[in-house]
Amino acid sequence: MGVQFPALKTMVTVFLLLMGNMSPVVMKSSIPLRKVKMVASKVVTPGSSLYGVALKDLADTSYNITCTLQVENWIRYRLIVPSVQMVYGVVTTTPIAIEPAKREAFAVRKTSDTASGVAGSVSWELEKARRRFVIMWSVPDNFNSFGYWMGLGMTREGLVDPDKDWYGQMYSGSSDGDLTFTRKDFSYNTDSIIYSNDKFEVEGDMTNTQHAQIKIVIRPSSNNWKDLAPKIRRKLKKKPKPARQRDN
């Protein structure tokens, strides 16, 4: 006997209906940033460079000018191949790769017996995203003549090699086709700065003290939540448990 066409048609119809109801898991772009921040504050944890130690404790305070830099990675890409270019000062703890949903840090200090502060740039490659994320900083020795500067930026897609000239460009130059950025003097106003492009956003804070602290968050832009770190995405998608009713 041949297959009865009405039965086959019914099976195909049911299959298509089921497939139509199996929507792919997609993060809604309407999720507000404040909710992402709330979840990230619970999910992002210290990596090996901060295991059992506070950020301030990384600074070598036997020197009067230091800077500690902390980066939180809220994106799904690893931040790899860190590269530091020091203009003034020396590195005391080196930057390392940063896994998704982790925070890592490193520290720098002034050079011994010099009248200079600490200044330089550090960058990480966004693994599989084919671009590099860059931080510029300057903590002065003479607070009356120089400011507390920080810059945040990112290279174009396809450019992953670090450049020794990024510090100078971000301190006193302007964005170009290879590197776009924003910068700010934190000497009198310590409000956050934000750099953004079509896919990513970087937010940074800097204190204006001799032992400066820089705290950075790299995250997807609000129309690109699919690039959030998996741990953050899972927490955002998790439905809250219904409140238990009390027995009368």
UniProtKB/Swiss-Prot annotation:
Entry's family note: Belongs to the actinoporin family. Conoidea subfamily.
Record note on modification: 9 isoforms are detected in the injectable venom, mainly corresponding to different oxidative states.
GO molecular function: toxin activity
Alphabetical list of InterPro entries matching this protein: Actinoporin_PFT, Cytolysin/lectin
Tissue spec: Expressed by the venom duct.
Subunit structure: Octamer or nonamer in membranes. Monomer in the soluble state.
Positions of region (N-terminal region): 45-64
Residues reported in the UniProt entry to bind phosphocholine: G120, S138, P140, Y167, Y171
Any GO BP annotation: monoatomic ion transport
GO cellular component, one term: other organism cell membrane
Further remark: Found in injectable (milked) (IV) venom. The mature peptide contains 1 cysteine residue.
Protein name as catalogued: Conoporin-Cn1
Lineage: Eukaryota, Metazoa, Spiralia, Lophotrochozoa, Mollusca
The entry's keywords: Cytolysis, Ion transport, Membrane, Nematocyst, Secreted, Signal, Target cell membrane, Target membrane, Toxin, Transmembrane, Transport
Location (main, coarse): secreted
Signal peptide residues on this chain, from the entry's feature table: 1-23
Function text: Pore-forming protein that forms pores of around 1 nm and causes cardiac stimulation and cytolysis.
UniProt-annotated location(s): Secreted; Nematocyst; Target cell membrane
